Regions:
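Helix-terminus loop motifs that line ligand-binding clefts
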Residues: 88-117, 124-195, 199
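Acidic/polar, glycine-enriched structural segments that form the non-catalytic walls/loops
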Residues: 1-113, 131-136, 142-152
Length: 200
């Protein structure tokens, strides 16, 4: 982002100025319309809940003890869709480790994209959950990784093609990370990420 020539201060100021011109009711109405455009595409019903009057933590406890609660499974499915709708939009960055809910100045794992499973898991349901266009931030990142990863592959392995190691970030870094050699030097993130291109 700091290499693309945009003035982030001006962009943020323009967004804030535009938002301040709207009243709360208009902002809420726009938000609901925008959100429902994605959310209302899917309705999943497995069974009526017999536990809907029980607090969620108790339902989860009962579920882990073997109680059947298909409505809880539906709730989790829709919660996963909510998270992706809220954190991955065309033209933006992909959903990352902490997402938009991070409250740290320096978040755990830098809120990066861990390519040995975490980044992929965020998007496992995107196509089957009828949210295909929310896949595009990850697909755009993969295209950028193919460019930076080509240089990494040449520099580290003297080989053709491209790679991304265990972690990447909004700058599409692909080189090995510091940390335990058991994961820091893992060069197969690109291969795994390419499954998302195929699914899309």
């Amino acid at each position: 982002p700091d290499k693309d020539g945009k003035d982030e201060s001006k962009l943020a100021g323009d967004y804030l100025t535009a938002a301040l011109r709207k009243n709360f009711d208009d902002l809420k109405k726009n938000h609901i319309s925008d959100y429902q455009h994605y959310f209302n595409r899917v309705n999943l019903s497995l069974a009526a809940s017999t536990y809907s009057d029980i607090p969620l933590d108790e339902r989860l406890k009962r579920y882990t003890e073997g109680a059947k609660d298909p409505a809880l499974e539906v709730l989790y499915f829709q919660f996963g869709r909510y998270l992706l709708i809220s954190s991955s939009r065309p033209g933006g960055i992909p959903a990352n480790l902490q997402g938009i809910w991070n409250h740290h100045v320096r978040p755990p794992w830098s809120s990066n994209f861990t390519t040995n499973i975490n980044a992929e898991m965020n998007y496992w349901m995107v196509e089957t959950a009828n949210l295909s266009e929310l896949h595009t931030p990850l697909l755009d990142l993969i295209q950028r990784l193919a460019i930076t990863g080509k240089e990494t592959t040449q520099n580290f392995y003297h080989a053709p093609g491209w790679t991304v190691h265990h972690n990447t970030d909004i700058w599409a870094t692909t080189n090995p990370m510091s940390g335990s050699p058991s994961w820091a030097n893992w060069p197969l993130g690109g291969a795994w990420l390419c499954q998302h291109l195929w699914e899309h």
